[in-house]
Amino acid sequence: MPGFRRVERLPRQLLGISAFEGDVCPTRVRLFARGSASRTLPFPHPWNYRQPIRILESYFCGADAEQGWGRHNRYLEIPGFSPIFVTRDPRIIRAIATETGDRPGQFDRDALPSGGIARATGTDTLLYANGPMWKRQKKLSTPPFGRTTLFQPEQFHEFAETFRRTVRQRLAALEQRLGREGSPVRVRLEPEIKAIMLEMLANNFFGAQISYQQIRDRYVPALDRVIEFIVIDTVINKLGIPLRRLPSFSRWIAEAKDAHAAFDQLTDLTLATRSAGRGLWKQFKSDAPDRALRSNIKVFLAGALEATTSYASWAISHLSRNASAQDKVFHEVKDIDDYTPENLASAKYLNRALDETLRLTPSLYFFPRRATADTWVETTDGNRLWMPKGTHVLLDVWHANRHEDHWGVAVTGYPALDFVPERWENVTAHDRGTKDLLHFGFGHGPRFCPGKHLGQLEVGLVVGAFVKLFRFKAVNRECQVRAGVSTKPADGVLVELELRERSFAESTAATAPRELNGL
């Protein structure tokens, strides 16, 4: 908040007068409230930053006892600071997301929660930039991600072949474990999913030629460490000191530097294929030098890997706890031998299961925005909210998607907290299409995720093929959420796994290398 506005707002803040006006009246959240049932303070600090979902929950402590707009819209205001507005109301989320862009008076993406990402990748990125710079980055970076590019049969076939090759290798490893331990085998799938996703990103999308062993043993662990450092750096590094300037006085800093070096090497390998026009570089029409693209490539590698791993991990986790849904997906995909765009689109129950995954457990649990001017926000039903310039906005899609008011029995026919792909059939039957019920899984409005179609392609391939090959059941009855940059199942997708058709597995594994040590 600039100096004059800071002083101007101070009397109202001290008197507890709301900064917001209009039909939508958010309820104030007290920083410290006697008798509060909240389990943490409503902002990240060194003792709660690993629990961001709980931080968002703290804004809505006791909110379900309210009626009116304050039930789903809250704000925190501390004298001397800009207000923080948090909403789990889909109407407000949609309105603000729609009005996020580069035009005067529109919302920016709030850079405050992304400081660690910017220090790790660069500020000149589609993720971090705002205004005209964001518009330039969008024009430069997004063409290869379009549906018309990714869903061409030739490109789709390349992704399918990579996955098929990887599955053959993993089947060989599984056969070894089955021989040693019998069936079923207990497996933590998240590391395997992450390696498969990174292989498709690096080798198919960018046309690199990196061995699966290198991806799994070097680059995936390095990116995990980079992501972990980004989260910690965002909360703790208030001075914005780059990692390269920190002395390696601890093992943690030294390991973080090694991980960033591996990340740089992976970025080099993906950029090296540009001159040859391999992968989707052939769709990239720009004279920009490699150094101008480097930051966006790093954001893409880390961000797309996080998002697609989260998406696929949650889908498999949900299906592992819902045998009926898993069987329905299997009967739909069991006869698919060639993964074409048409075949994936025809797998309607699989696609409903994926939509339900994004609703119940979105990869990105909130979207940060900031008001660039005093502004009115108007919902599709005509209600209005005025907020002052500088307001920090958190669009809390995690709790919006899981609330009974928005997705419960009265609206969709099923409880909001249950994983029910049939929910989407019910929605369609009652003429409530995607314009009325949005899961915001890829964001919304001008700043929606440019990797949406890539995510749909990769996760559709992985989940469809996985269900076709394996029968799996969760080890733990319930699964909590683990959240950092994205959300993931806290148990790492721990399942008991067995092959559906041993004869098929044996014939497939017979042609695969057997030097891998197991899942």
PLM region spans:
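C-terminal domain-closing interface element
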Residues: 248-252, 350, 355-369, 491-519
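Cytochrome P450 heme-binding "Cys pocket" and the immediately downstream C-terminal segment
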Residues: 323-326, 444, 448, 452-489, ...
